[in-house]
């Protein structure tokens, strides 16, 4: 039987010279493998007498435990060294700038809606909302739009069924509000509206903001003052002027188209007028005591003018290259 002390010393030196786990596994095989020196020593126990065998077996087991302990110690040291090398190679330079994280932004139409609401709130208007699917009564009849009016035709209006439509304007919000509240009333009604139309300046879905002011002594002069003040502040132009051209709308009398001064000329911006007595009758307001004005502006139109966009469809094509300009 080999000298057991020699095996321990040799194994410790052998393990210490190993630089990798693969080298260590090869060294392990020389001592603990099928043909390893300790395995051979255990096989040699059969040649000993019954009296010698217990002591020799115990001695071999002690040596085996010491060899395994030396093996584990070296394996742990190699793994620790490899981990330290890996960490050193992956050191993070904390002085480098962080990766930029893309952030979202509001759609330009949403930006315009927020600005419109903020400006009108600052002069005492409340913001009112209503359903986008309206009954025939609220979208047409209560607004003095007769049954034979072209606006009721299928080529202009999206019908949900015989009695309900996708609202063609936010005027129904005003009708609901006048039914529920008593004068004086001072509101704007922003929101989505729907019409059968689509080209560079029209979309089947677009946004409107309509205004309504009902009180005892309201006049066209109040209407002009409110609209001009709003447009001057919206476009940040104190020299901006507003003019009115006679027009016709079933729900206002008199009615007018509104133009604003723009690039040396005049640009149509919306419609307006004094609330028709028939509309007041439908909502239970005494037209002898109260007067009111109403106006409507296209939100996409305001957005196009404010940001210099010449095609309405760009707002709804979801091209991030375009939309990021406004974020």
Swiss-Prot record:
Entry annotated with the keyword Acetylation: no
Necessary cofactors: Mg(2+)
A GO MF term: tRNA binding
EC number, UniProt record: 6.1.1.20
Enzyme class: ligase
Gene Ontology terms: cellular component: cytoplasm
CDD domains in UniProt: PheRS_alpha_core
Compartments reported by the entry: Cytoplasm
PROSITE patterns: AA_TRNA_LIGASE_II
Entry note: cofactor: Binds 2 magnesium ions per tetramer.
Residues the entry annotates as binding Mg(2+): 253
GO process terms (BP): phenylalanyl-tRNA aminoacylation
Catalytic activity: tRNA(Phe) + L-phenylalanine + ATP = L-phenylalanyl-tRNA(Phe) + AMP + diphosphate + H(+)
Keywords: Aminoacyl-tRNA synthetase, ATP-binding, Cytoplasm, Ligase, Magnesium, Metal-binding, Nucleotide-binding, Protein biosynthesis
NCBIfam families on file: pheS
Subunit structure: Tetramer of two alpha and two beta subunits.
Family: Belongs to the class-II aminoacyl-tRNA synthetase family. Phe-tRNA synthetase alpha subunit type 1 subfamily.
Protein name: Phenylalanine--tRNA ligase alpha subunit
Gene that specifies this protein: pheS
């Amino acid at each position: 039987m080999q000298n057991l002390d020699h095996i321990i010393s040799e194994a410790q030196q052998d393990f210490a010279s190993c630089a990798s786990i693969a080298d260590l596994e090869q060294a392990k095989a020389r001592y603990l493998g099928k043909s390893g020196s300790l395995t051979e020593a255990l096989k040699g126990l059969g040649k000993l007498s019954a009296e010698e065998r217990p002591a020799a077996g115990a001695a071999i087991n002690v040596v085996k435990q010491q060899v395994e302990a030396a093996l584990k110690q070296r394996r742990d040291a190699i793994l620790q060294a490899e981990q330290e090398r890996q960490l050193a190679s992956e050191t993070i330079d904390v002085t480098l700038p962080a990766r930029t994280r893309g952030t979202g932004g509001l759609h330009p139409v949403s930006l315009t809606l927020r600005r419109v609401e903020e400006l009108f709130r600052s002069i005492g208007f409340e913001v009112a909302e209503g359903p986008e699917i309206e009954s025939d009564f609220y979208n047409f009849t209560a607004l003095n739009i007769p049954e034979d009016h072209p606006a009721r035709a299928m080529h202009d209006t999206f019908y949900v069924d015989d009695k309900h439509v996708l609202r063609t304007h936010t005027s129904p919000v005003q009708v609901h509000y006048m039914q529920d509240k008593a004068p004086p009333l001072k509101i704007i009604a922003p929101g989505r509206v729907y019409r059968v139309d689509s080209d560079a300046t029209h979309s089947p879905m677009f946004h409107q903001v309509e205004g309504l002011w009902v009180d005892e002594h309201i006049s066209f002069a109040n209407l002009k003052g409110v609209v001009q003040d709003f447009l001057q502040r919206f476009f940040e132009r104190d020299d901006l002027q507003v003019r009115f051209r006679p027009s016709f709308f079933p729900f206002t009398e008199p009615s007018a188209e509104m133009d604003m001064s723009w690039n040396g000329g005049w640009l149509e911006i919306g419609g307006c007028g004094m609330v028709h007595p028939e509309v007041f009758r439908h909502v239970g307001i005494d037209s002898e005591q109260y007067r009111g004005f109403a106006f409507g502006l296209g939100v996409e139109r305001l957005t196009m003018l404010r940001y210099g966009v010449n095609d309405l469809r760009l707002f709804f094509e979801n091209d991030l290259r375009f939309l990021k300009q406004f974020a």
